[in-house]
Every structure is written in structure tokens, then in C-alpha cells.
Amino acid sequence: MRSLSLFTALLAGQAFAYPKPVLQSSTRRDWPTINEFLTELAEIMPIGDTVSAACDLIGDAEDVAADLFDISNTENDACGDVTVLFARGTCDPGNVGVLVGPWFFNSLETALPNKKVGVKGVPYPASVQGFLSGSVQPGIDMANQIKSVISSCPNTKLVLGGYSQGSMVVHNAASNLDAATMAKVSAVVLFGDPYDGRPVANYDASKVLVVCHDGDNICQGGDFILLPHLTYAEDADTAAAFVKPLVS
């Protein structure tokens, strides 16, 4: 269920100096529902400003939400039956962020109860400059990480995932690998992809899911953080359902 009404008051789109975010309710809770999560984020997330202007607040807000709901923003698991390499978005904390990655992993574990799911974050800077310049070197580094996982864990079902700038990184990684290597990847899932509409290089398009919300300026090649770019947690179950038959 969409939660757009939760953010109505935040859609003015005016740039301003952001204070460090503080949630009104700070008692640590169990893993939230989507609506609970988005309601809390509505208090603290920047909407209507550029990535450059909002970067610090994005990281601070995700740190607050991660602490409130005990959500891990860093994953360095061993390979599982299914292994997810995930590249977080610009300014997201840890190596998988909070807004999208953990929700996707949780949904995938629920969809695959009889399989061990291992998650590895892609260790790249996720900086504003990286986003603006196309995140080329992180793509090369992720390509090497993909080759390492394939070599060390030949029996795992490998899933590549990315959010926002992380989707750029996945695109660039695929461009640095040949088709024979990419054929060993079971699925690719991209959320809020700045390169929406471009194919993932050297890979079967039927195994790619790109989720871009209507009105997401990042998916349109822009650099404004609007409401639709912050709500991809809503699509975690859909993404997991897409991946499930490809790794079963």
C-alpha cells in the first residue's frame, strides 16, 4: 500500500539549511511495518532538494532510523545458497544503507525460507561527486568483487542489487565483465536507477528488474530528491518475488 499521504506536508520543495534530524519518538522498536518506517522518515528526510544539498541529512536520517528500528546498514556475510551483492545509494550509511537494501534482504529471506541468504555490501564511497561523475571506478571495483564471489563460491546463486547511485555501479560493473561472467549471475534488481531505460550490459534482460517510481527525478536523469525516490522499501516484496524463481 502506498504511503504518499504521509509526506504531503513535506512536498514544498524548498531548499533550506537542515538541522540534524531527531525523531519525536526515540524508543527502540522491533522491525517496523513499511508505514511505520515511512512515517518516521517523514519527520526527518529531505524532500525537494538536490543530492548535493541534502547529502549530510540523508546519512544522518538513515542513522537515526537504523538505531530506532535496529536495522543493520552493514552486511559482510559469507556466501549463502543465495548471495546478494548490493550497492547502496548516495550518502547512505554503512555498505548497504537503510532505505532499501535491508528491506529487500528481509523480503528475500522470507520468500526463500529453505535457503541461506548471504549479503555483501559493495564497499564504495557513495559520494555526491561519484554520483555526478557516473561512479566509474566503483563499477570497476564491483566487477572485481563479482569475479571474486564467483571464484570463491561457485555454487552460490548470485544476485546483484543497487539503489540510486548503486544502480549506476551495477551498470558499470556489468560493462566491465564479459557475457560469460555475467551469465553466472542469477538476477539483477535495481531501485531508483539513474540509468533507467539502459540495458544491463552483457546480460539477459529477462533476469533484470528495474523499479522506478513515477515522478522520481533521479530515474529521469536529474539530481533532486523527491518523495518517489525515498519509498522503494515498498517494492521489496515485489523484488523478492521476481528473484525467487531465478534462484530456486
From Swiss-Prot:
Q: What is its EC number?
A: 3.1.1.74
Q: Which UniProt keywords apply?
A: Disulfide bond, Hydrolase, Secreted, Serine esterase, Signal
- The entry's active site is 164, 216, 229
- Superkingdom per UniProt: Eukaryota
Q: How is it modified after translation?
A: The 2 disulfide bonds play a critical role in holding the catalytic residues in juxta-position; reduction of the disulfide bridges results in the complete inactivation of the enzyme.
The cross-references to Pfam families, in alphabetical order and at most eight, read: Cutinase
- Induction, per UniProt: Induced during growth on olive oil. Induced during growth on the lipidic carbon source 16-hydroxyhexadecanoic acid (synthetic cutin monomer). Induced during growth on plant material. Induced during growth on pectin. Repressed during growth on glucose carbon source.
**Disulphide bridges:** 79-153, 212-219
- What reaction does this catalyse? cutin + H2O = cutin monomers
Does the UniProt entry include the keyword Disulfide bond?
A: yes
Look up the signal peptide feature and give its range. 1-17
Any one Gene Ontology BP term: carbohydrate catabolic process
Q: Where in the chain is the site Transition state stabilizer?
A: 90, 165
Q: Which InterPro entries match?
A: AB_hydrolase_fold, Cutinase/axe, CUTINASE_1, CUTINASE_2, Cutinase_monf
Gene Ontology molecular functions: cutinase activity
What pH dependence does Swiss-Prot or TrEMBL list here? Optimum pH is 7.5-8.
Could you tell me where this protein is found in the cell? Secreted
Q: Name one GO cellular component term.
A: extracellular region
Instruction: Give the record's family classification.
Output: Belongs to the cutinase family.
Q: Which PANTHER family match?
A: CUTINASE, CUTINASE 2-RELATED
Q: What does this protein do?
A: Catalyzes the hydrolysis of complex carboxylic polyesters found in the cell wall of plants. May degrade cutin, a macromolecule that forms the structure of the plant cuticle. May also degrade suberin, a specialized macromolecule found in the cell wall of various plant tissues.
- Please state what the protein is called: Cutinase cut1
Question: Gene for this protein?
Answer: cut1
